[in-house]
Amino acid sequence: MSLLVVGLNHRTAPTSLLEQASVSGDDTPKVLHDLAAAAHVNEAVVLSTCNRTEIYADVETFHGGVADISDQLSRISGIDLGDLAGHLYVHHDARAVGHLFSVVCGLDSMLVGESQILGQVRGAFRTGQSAGVAGSALSGLFQAALRVGKRAHSETSIDAAGASIVAVGIRLAASSLGILSEVPAVPVAPPGGVAGELGGAAVLAAPVAEPPPLAGARVLLIGAGAVGSLAAQTARRAGATEIVIANRTPARAARVAEMHDGRAVGLTDLPHEILMADLVISSTGATGLVVDHDLVAAALPGRGGRPLVFLDLALPHDIDPGVRALPGVSLIDLEALRVALDGAQVAHDVEAVRALVSTEVAGFLDRRRAGRVAPTVVALRAHADSVVHGELARLHSRLPDLDDREWELVEGAVRRVVDKLLHAPTVRVQQLAGAPGGDSYAEALRELFDLPREVPAVVSAPDLDLVERS
């Protein structure tokens, strides 16, 4: 049995495919039970957000588990497995642990450091438990991951990494629009301090200079994920008069619009909304351009010469770089933000969390290896106790004249000899279990003492035909 994660995210798949592969809350229990019924899957948890759909599982075999989970993702998305496979990534055992720990800390998010993912992982785990599909193997993994996530968000300033990008982007955009009056800034909280709210989950606001306000500005946000929600929050606090949320999925646009007192529209409304907007912030994660040169050029004649600023927070770009050549149009992209942002501090925070994740992964794997040896030690002692019991019974029948005191001494001596013989190897195998390759010592004990094969065996990662992709 081993840990496995198979999934797709904003780095490996376009938004349209992510939407097809997403699993709603109502559908999750059925998906979980379908996974549990698969031949090679013992336990499962489904994590489905705007930017990822991942299935974490404890599986009997690597290849069988990958096949079962990939088939399930194909059924969910309605996409032929041959077409879907190129967008999937697979992580096994240690890399699966490291991936989950990175995800829950926000390192793998489109908005680095966002803490909304912590609540989403917790919810996915609880759903798996409620469905009876997340057992002891995944419970230990997810409980450890949630502890790591809490540490990352309370002991470092990783929350500020992504929030800083949004805040600085809006400050630069407001400066380009020529709006310079002062309004209250987004509250700042230190690590472990009081946080604001993003999508029902705590998120620390950016500890950066107050962004110039957007008093009187109309702001159009394209994309309703974590980045779009944070941008809406920041723009609203900066004084934006009107906030419009455009998204491929109307329900998501409506949800974010309701959170930030905005208005939801579809992507087909972009020509009119660009005509009316002062600032357009885009963060869809689409693989192609969302706003091209011709769309913007067509809107300019009706704007009366008002400046128009685009803030492109997506990678790859949502906004056609060619719009920079249009009169009165400015474009701020991630490269420009990296120059304006204190990149050294952001890099320091990210590296601090990566170091934390690395340490926690090593500790988790050590504990798991040691835990896997425990059943073997228990089986060995049970085997020894059975042998002692049988031999004492045989001895008792041959020495019926021994009184209770004499028999107690004989039994005690036999048990002490057996305990002393077993003490050194059982203690040593537990010590060695935490080291790489330590599983082999438990296997040796099972072979030498012919212990029952139902004792969980440790299967180390083989040379895999399927390359693990990030």
UniProtKB/Swiss-Prot annotation:
EC number: 1.2.1.70
Positions with a binding annotation for NADP(+): G223, A224, G225, A226, V227, G228
Site (Important for activity): residue numbering on this chain: H99
This protein's pathway: Porphyrin-containing compound metabolism; protoporphyrin-IX biosynthesis; 5-aminolevulinate from L-glutamyl-tRNA(Glu): step 1/2
Source organism superkingdom: Bacteria
Disulfide bonds: none
InterPro entries, per database record: 4pyrrol_synth_GluRdtase, 4pyrrol_synth_GluRdtase_dimer, 4pyrrol_synth_GluRdtase_N, GluRdtase_CS, GluRdtase_dimer_dom_sf, GluRdtase_N_sf, NAD(P)-bd_dom_sf, Shikm_DH/Glu-tRNA_Rdtase
CDD domains: NAD_bind_Glutamyl_tRNA_reduct
GO molecular function, one term: NADP binding
One BP annotation, GO: protoporphyrinogen IX biosynthetic process from glutamate
The reaction(s) this protein catalyses: (S)-4-amino-5-oxopentanoate + tRNA(Glu) + NADP(+) = L-glutamyl-tRNA(Glu) + NADPH + H(+)
Annotated catalytic residues: C50
Signal sequence extent: none
Amino acids binding substrate: T49, C50, N51, R52, S109, E114, S115, Q116, Q120
Description of its domains: Possesses an unusual extended V-shaped dimeric structure with each monomer consisting of three distinct domains arranged along a curved 'spinal' alpha-helix. The N-terminal catalytic domain specifically recognizes the glutamate moiety of the substrate. The second domain is the NADPH-binding domain, and the third C-terminal domain is responsible for dimerization.
Extra information: During catalysis, the active site Cys acts as a nucleophile attacking the alpha-carbonyl group of tRNA-bound glutamate with the formation of a thioester intermediate between enzyme and glutamate, and the concomitant release of tRNA(Glu). The thioester intermediate is finally reduced by direct hydride transfer from NADPH, to form the product GSA.
Function: Catalyzes the NADPH-dependent reduction of glutamyl-tRNA(Glu) to glutamate 1-semialdehyde (GSA).
NCBIfam families in the record: PRK00045.1-3 (NF000744)
Subunit relationships: Homodimer.
Descriptive protein name: Glutamyl-tRNA reductase
Organism: Frankia alni (strain DSM 45986 / CECT 9034 / ACN14a)
